[in-house]
């Protein structure tokens, strides 16, 4: 079980857009700088999210991307499904089944875990994510990402 960089970076971008939701569009370069994601990769992710109506784009000098709906109406599951072409990719890292085929006990446990992950992703909205990050004080940590050069 793992999230690809597509989902990880996509969720980071959506988090940034959710923080700025009522303020209008956010430039790709500002998200790129804040989250340390290349502009070209970020544009690919945001274009994919745009095709699925999770974000909107605005052209021009003050343009950028914004959420197409409120943060409380977009779940993490919505984002992951778009970026992973469904949820199956999230569960692709199944444990080795061994030389005698799949172990039914492992398969049962793995299925339950996959179901719980889906439940959590589908029950957690972008608004929930923003509130949880703030509640835990992680927003301050995210604000102070330092780059050291030796």
Predicted regions and their residues:
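Basic amphipathic alpha-helical segments that dock to polyanions
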Residues: 45-50
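Conserved segment of winged-helix/HTH DNA-binding domains
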Residues: 71-95, 114-115
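Beta-hairpin "wing" of winged helix-turn-helix
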Residues: 54-62, 66-67
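Key DNA-contact positions within bacterial/archaeal DNA-binding proteins
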Residues: 40
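C-terminal regulatory/oligomerization modules of transcriptional regulators
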Residues: 97-150
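N-terminal helix-turn-helix DNA-binding core of bacterial DNA-binding proteins
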Residues: 3-5, 15-37, 66
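Residue cluster at the C-terminal edge of the helix-turn-helix DNA-binding motif
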Residues: 51-54, 82
């Amino acid at each position: 079980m793992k999230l690809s960089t597509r989902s990880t970076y996509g969720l980071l971008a959506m988090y940034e857009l959710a923080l700025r939701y009522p303020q209008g569009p956010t430039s790709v370069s500002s998200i790129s700088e804040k989250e340390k994601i290349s502009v070209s990769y970020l544009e690919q992710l945001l274009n994919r999210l745009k095709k699925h109506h999770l974000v909107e784009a605005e052209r021009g000098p003050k343009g950028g991307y914004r959420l197409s709906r409120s943060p409380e109406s977009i779940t993490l599951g919505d984002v992951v499904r778009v970026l992973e072409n469904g949820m199956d990719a999230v569960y692709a890292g199944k444990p080795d089944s061994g030389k005698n085929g799949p172990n039914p006990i492992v398969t049962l446990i793995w299925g339950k875990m996959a179901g719980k992950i889906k439940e959590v992703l589908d029950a957690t909205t972008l608004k929930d994510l923003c509130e949880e990050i703030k509640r835990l004080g992680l927003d301050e940590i995210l604000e102070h990402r330092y780059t050291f050069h030796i």
